[in-house]
Amino acid sequence: MSNGSIRPDEVTDILRRELGDFETEAEEYEAGTVLEAGDGIATLYGLSNAQASELVEFPEQDVEGMVLNLEEDNVGVILFGDVDAVSEGDEARRTGRIASVGVNENMLGRVIDPLGRPLDGKGPIEGEKTVLPLERKAPGVIYREPVEEPLQTGIKAIDSMIPVGRGQRELVIGDRQTGKTAVLTDTIINQKKTHQEGTDSGDPVYCVYVAVGQKDSTVAQVQRDLERNGALEHTVIVNASASMPTPLQYVAPFAGACIGEYFRDTGRDSLVCFDDLSKQAVAYRELSLLLRRPPGREAYPGDIFYLHSRLLERAAKIISDEEVATQMNGLPDALQDKVQGGGSLTALPVIETQAGDVSAYIPTNVISITDGQIYLETDLFNSGIRPAIDVGNSVSRVGGSAQIDAMKDVASTLRIDLSQYRELEAFAKFGSDLDPSTQQQLNRGERLVEILNQDQFSPVPVEEQVAIIYAAINGHLDDVPVDDIEDFEEEYLERLRLRHEDVLTEIRETEELTDAAEEVFEEVAADMADVYAEDEEEEEEDVLADEGATA
């Protein structure tokens, strides 16, 4: 046979070799068709196997959505992204993935949307992300511990009378423009010292601020305030502003809880501020009505209570026993090898009332879900009392056990003293003849109110709060003019810092108020009160002398 002839066995080998590496690639997916779309929702036909909360993609429009309604012959989907891009007849595909957000440490200091995409122009969020589902079951009873560790807000009125513990849910409620966001930002700023070495302020607290339906300018202001005060580096801001699609406003609080749970389940403490849940409820009402769910009271859907309860129940103090913590119900697979016990998630939800009506539908719902409320009142705010906390209507149902012993000792009568002052103040307006004991109560009440006044961005360490409240409760400010109380407080605390730093450090470290510390507070407060009282007498003498000269 000549060299140019074809050998069948060689041809067979070549074909076998070539065809052996050949693989067929067929993409299999379940597709459906958009029946109608608009206002942030789409109704799809053909996705009969879709699951609740599953992500659906619209490949031609590069838009994603989440399944919210499962009906007999169609599926209701809420749309994330460019909601106007989806129209009737478009193709939609199942992804098989539940709506999730990728979380890692590099999110701290960033502003993101509820799907984890950066909004601050600082580039992508680097590093490997742990993908966690937006919806997740709350930890069961056996995976929780009692709330016993304080979360210091740095706000005297709260830490002394309405204490918040790590793992608690404390509602901040009030009309618009009463300082609700200021309470949240001050609390976040006060956690800065937990990240500084050598401050003995407890374990670091990682913060998440969730803005729902806020103006973009408001969110930008919060970001600037946190950055200016050195608190942004331990905070994640989740922004679903009023200009964003309604579905993103609905899922934003779940995304915030998700990020907080990442820190909680890895053995750390986290704080999530929801500002505010009233707007989330409005967003959910809008979506429910568009999806033709039957409306109930105030046109909210029947499961509006469950919306907030399942969100806020995710706040918890997790059991310290690591072996038990790893068995936690609903734990995502992505966290399985990272779980550590002893973490906590504290929630500070905000509800905006209309004309002070706390008996409306959403306020009463959230009050019944949370472990207490901080009620901010318009009249107090307008009269110059900041923060404008109405002590009579505010309560902390579990935080008391988390309050440090030193604060319990000095502030045990503070709430009742203020309540009696408010009552007497109302009666005193009707008559001028008051007996000495009533006048003395009014005088002290005025000074207590003044002591609890506090400028924004000026959190007070708990040991200094103990010192100044001790002086006020024990009558050392009774003879100090009300106008001089602020100066007295500054000088008093400055003197303690300079001359008795060891006493303040001891209170911070031991959380106890010793007899020696009380003696120091008594001595310093009495000396300064005498000076201020003498100054007042001299001023009165000068006024009398001037009047005599004029006569």
Curated annotation (Swiss-Prot):
Name of the protein in question: ATP synthase subunit alpha
Subunit structure and binding partners: F-type ATPases have 2 components, CF(1) - the catalytic core - and CF(0) - the membrane proton channel. CF(1) has five subunits: alpha(3), beta(3), gamma(1), delta(1), epsilon(1). CF(0) has three main subunits: a(1), b(2) and c(9-12). The alpha and beta chains form an alternating ring which encloses part of the gamma chain. CF(1) is attached to CF(0) by a central stalk formed by the gamma and epsilon chains, while a peripheral stalk is formed by the delta and b chains.
Ion transport keyword on record: yes
Superkingdom of origin organism: Bacteria
GO function terms (MF aspect): ADP binding; ATP binding; proton-transporting ATP synthase activity, rotational mechanism
One Gene Ontology CC term in the entry: plasma membrane
Record bears the keyword Ribosomal protein: no
Classification via PANTHER family: ATP SYNTHASE SUBUNIT ALPHA, MITOCHONDRIAL
